[in-house]
């Protein structure tokens, strides 16, 4: 092969000494793999992570401009206040744990378990999620309306396997040490902190035992249980639904969607078994865990020792500016999105992106129409769904109005709670209302893309339209290999093991002929088996059931862009 100069995707990352027919992976990126090292402040290195870090640099420049001339930019003062309050470690250290004193006092005031639902609601209003998780999102079987979903929660570790598998025993021991350190920082004696840690782990292990695994949570049908509000009140009386939701939602909905009913039943038994003082310790831990990164330096560093270093392998924390930027992304990110689009997104490139999307859609449709194992009736419905699939590119037509948030450059925790409650009020206020099809659930600078099943659409934010994934000045072949494979990946999600359960309107219903669904499941099982056979580390294999949707999308994405 004739050697070429580096272009957008950097040929120097390839290993041209390898025959692509023997080892395409190393041919494509072998040299990059050999010379790349995971940064000490990152758990991973990849094109996505490198581009994300570059994007954060751009966001930092925007924020520094807001600090210098806040009146020059929309939401300039708000962004400047949030950034400055985060990096002001002198004030944070002086305040110590005082910003969360009012939350801890509310926990200490708990006298009876019947008061627990109201306390859970108070904690949620103050950005502390505990036993259960609320999600106001489109009803999976009536995607035109927002419904209130209730899901399992209550765990500090990523999922239930961390509490029960022998392989992860060392992780649990480190987790216990981290809880002890955090309670010691808060002022507990060694004995008190040890008892608190043992209590937290005991309660969370009980919760893990009644929780579904990540693999089980992927199945949309098994995690959809529509229940009238009256039935919920009777079945889960211990939650005192009215007290639980009165301060969170403007009006109780007629029905709820309960993701895991057996979890709520089991949780009631756990709460009944545990004494009130131990429940208080559990709740205090979740306050400390949820707020440590917004408090003093020692609290943030202590949390990182386990949740950063131990769980992810990240050796050191990101620099302060990076963490401050991330804080803004997670609170008032839409304000930053608007300025990012103005400064960095080449709107003229959007036309080329649309053309590229249309060409990949054409290839996808042609291939779908030729599927030999699918009956014509199912194929016709699949094509209808594909033709109805929407595409959002770049950024939303409108951005959020943050004018009601009164910020201060000296009050990090106050800024956080105001932003959190602003968003909570916004999303909870839409329950039972019509879904806003124009809404973007991600920020414009996000270096990613996704398929939204309930909207039957793919979303391609402005942030993904950067080298090495996309460059409007380069040959189309390079862009098809970059952003093209990502677009194909997201289109395929509409027909993977879960996406295929949604119809063209974004509603979960069985639109496949029975025989076709059985054939699809057989083929999906083959993909699951293939990936489950891959050994990542000695004795550790890929969980093909958990990764199935992504594996199907990867295979489809590369096929269609080629």
Where are these predicted regions, by residue range?
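Intrinsically disordered, low-complexity linker/terminal regions across diverse proteins
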Residues: 1-2, 200, 206, 230, ...
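Active-site-surrounding "flap" and adjacent substrate/cofactor-binding loops of secreted or lumenal enzymes
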Residues: 2-5, 19-22, 27-93
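A charge-rich, low-complexity, intrinsically flexible signal that marks solvent-exposed coils, linkers
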Residues: 11-12, 16-20
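Short, surface-exposed beta-strand/loop micro-motifs that present aromatic residues
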Residues: 15, 135-138, 447-451
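Short, well-ordered loop/turn elements at secondary-structure boundaries
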Residues: 19-21, 126-129, 141-144, 273, ...
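Short amphipathic alpha-helical segments with coiled-coil-like heptad repeat character
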Residues: 27-41, 180-192, 388-390, 468, ...
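Short secondary-structure subsegments characteristic of cysteine-rich extracellular domains
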Residues: 41-63, 191-207, 479-485
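Noncatalytic, helix-rich "gating/capping" subdomain that lines the substrate-entry/channel surface
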Residues: 63-355, 359
């Amino acid at each position: 092969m004739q050697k070429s100069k580096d272009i957008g995707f950097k040929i120097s990352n390839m290993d041209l000494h390898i025959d692509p027919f023997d080892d395409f992976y190393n041919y494509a990126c072998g040299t990059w793999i050999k010379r790349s090292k995971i940064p000490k402040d990152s758990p991973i290195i990849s094109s996505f992570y490198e581009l994300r870090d570059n994007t954060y640099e751009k966001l930092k420049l925007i924020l520094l401009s807001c600090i210098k001339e806040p009146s020059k930019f929309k939401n300039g003062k708000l962004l400047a206040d949030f950034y400055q309050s985060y990096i002001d470690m002198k004030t944070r250290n002086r305040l110590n744990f005082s910003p969360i004193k009012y939350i801890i006092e509310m926990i200490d005031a708990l006298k009876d378990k019947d008061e627990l639902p109201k306390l859970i609601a108070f904690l949620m209003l103050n950005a502390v999620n505990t036993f259960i998780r609320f999600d106001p999102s489109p009803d999976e079987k009536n995607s035109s309306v927002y419904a209130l979903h209730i899901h399992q929660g209550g765990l500090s570790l990523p999922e239930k396997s961390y509490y029960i598998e022998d392989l992860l025993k060392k992780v649990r021991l480190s987790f216990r040490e981290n809880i002890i350190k955090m309670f010691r920082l808060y002022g507990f004696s060694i004995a008190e902190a040890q008892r608190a840690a043992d209590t937290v782990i005991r309660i969370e292990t009980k919760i893990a035992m009644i929780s579904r695994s990540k693999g089980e949570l992927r199945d949309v049908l098994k995690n959809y249980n529509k229940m009238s509000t009256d039935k919920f009140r009777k079945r889960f009386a211990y939650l005192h639904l009215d007290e639980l939701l009165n301060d969170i939602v403007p009006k109780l909905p007629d029905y709820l969607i309960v993701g895991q009913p057996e979890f709520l039943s089991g949780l009631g038994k756990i709460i009944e078994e545990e004494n009130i003082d131990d429940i208080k310790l559990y709740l205090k831990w979740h306050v400390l865990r949820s707020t440590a990164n917004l408090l003093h330096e020692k609290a943030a560093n202590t949390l990182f020792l386990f949740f950063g270093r131990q769980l992810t392998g990240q050796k050191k924390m990101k620099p302060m500016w990076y963490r401050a930027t991330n804080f803004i992304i997670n609170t008032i990110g839409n304000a930053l999105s608007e300025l990012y689009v103005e400064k960095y997104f080449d709107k003229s490139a959007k036309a080329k992106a649309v053309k590229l999307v249309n060409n990949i859609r054409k290839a996808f449709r042609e291939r779908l129409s030729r599927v030999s194992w699918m009956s014509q009736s199912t194929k016709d419905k699949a094509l209808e769904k594909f033709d109805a699939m929407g595409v959002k590119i770049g950024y939303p037509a409108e951005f959020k109005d943050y004018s009601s948030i009164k910020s201060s450059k000296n009050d990090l925790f106050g800024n956080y709670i105001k932003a959190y409650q602003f968003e909570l009020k916004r999303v909870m206020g839409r329950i039972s209302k019509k879904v806003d099809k124009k809404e973007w659930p991600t920020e414009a600078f996000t270096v990613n893309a996704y398929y939204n099943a309930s909207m039957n659409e793919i979303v391609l934010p402005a942030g993904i339209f950067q080298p090495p994934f996309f460059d409007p000045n380069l040959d189309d072949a390079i862009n098809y290999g970059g952003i093209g494979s990502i677009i194909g990946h997201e289109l395929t999600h509409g027909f993977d093991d879960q996406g295929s359960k949604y119809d063209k309107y974004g509603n979960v219903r069985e639109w496949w002929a029975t025989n076709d669904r059985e054939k699809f499941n057989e083929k999906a099982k083959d993909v699951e088996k293939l990936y489950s056979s891959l050994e990542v580390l000695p004795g550790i294999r890929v969980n093909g059931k958990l990764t199935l949707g992504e594996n199907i999308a990867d295979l489809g994405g590369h096929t269609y862009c080629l």
